[in-house]
């Protein structure tokens, strides 16, 4: 799986463009940054954007959904809990351990509540990487902010879901808070 990061948004947010090199099928992890650079890159690589994954529904991770939908009307929106009244048509609610293809690449959905009830991570076993949203950052765990956050759920998500992945798994988090954008578990 190929990965390209784009930094911007409100607080060093990161959106990731992921794609299958053999089929050119692509997805975006979080609609967190202005889409102009992403579109330019998609066009330069002749990629076919199919899916937009939302790691959780905090505004800084969903701000550019409509901009992406305007450019890519067929785009399927994928997240743990996506009510039609909030996200409109062509959305897909994901479940824990669900397998999602991007071309020949496979992502496994990991429900990781705590930072927010609908938080998910996306694990690519073959390339040993995980997109963690705000559940885990480089050098530290995510945090609990607001009434819907739950420290016990976050603890369980970290210790019972993420830290059981192979230790060489590379973390791609939702913000660039660390000394580098990604790091192994």
What are these regions (language model features)?
Residues 12, 23-26, 33-108:
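Active-site HxH/HxHxD metal-binding segment of metal-dependent hydrolases
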Residues 6, 18, 96-102, 175:
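Short acidic-hydrophobic surface loop/beta-edge motif
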Residues 116-185:
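Metallo-beta-lactamase
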Residues 6-7, 91, 111-113:
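Short Gly/Pro-enriched turn/cap motifs at secondary-structure boundaries
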Residues 1-45, 121-133:
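Conserved beta-strand hairpin/beta-sheet module of binuclear metal-dependent hydrolase folds
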Residues 97-99, 106-121, 140:
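Pocket-forming structural segment of enzyme catalytic cores
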Residues 52-62, 110-119, 172-178:
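Histidine-centered catalytic micro-motifs
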């Amino acid at each position: 799986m190929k990965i390209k990061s784009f930094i911007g948004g409100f607080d060093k947010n990161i959106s990731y463009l992921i794609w299958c090199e053999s089929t050119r099928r692509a997805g975006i992890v979080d609609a967190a940054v202005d889409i102009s650079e992403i579109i330019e890159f998609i066009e330069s690589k002749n990629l076919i954007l199919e899916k937009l994954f939302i790691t959780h529904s905090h505004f800084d991770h969903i701000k550019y959904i409509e901009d992406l939908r305007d450019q890519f009307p067929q785009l399927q929106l994928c997240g743990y809990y996506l009510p039609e009244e909030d996200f409109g048509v062509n959305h897909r609610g994901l479940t824990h351990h669900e397998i999602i293809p991007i071309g020949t690449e496979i992502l496994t959905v990991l429900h990781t509540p705590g930072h927010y009830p609908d938080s998910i991570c996306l694990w690519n076993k073959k390339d040993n990487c995980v997109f963690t949203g705000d559940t885990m950052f480089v050098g530290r765990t995510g945090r609990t902010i607001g009434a819907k956050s739950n420290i016990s759920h976050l603890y369980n998500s970290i210790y019972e879901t993420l830290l059981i992945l192979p230790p060489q798994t590379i973390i791609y988090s939702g913000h660039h808070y660390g000394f580098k954008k990604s790091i192994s578990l």
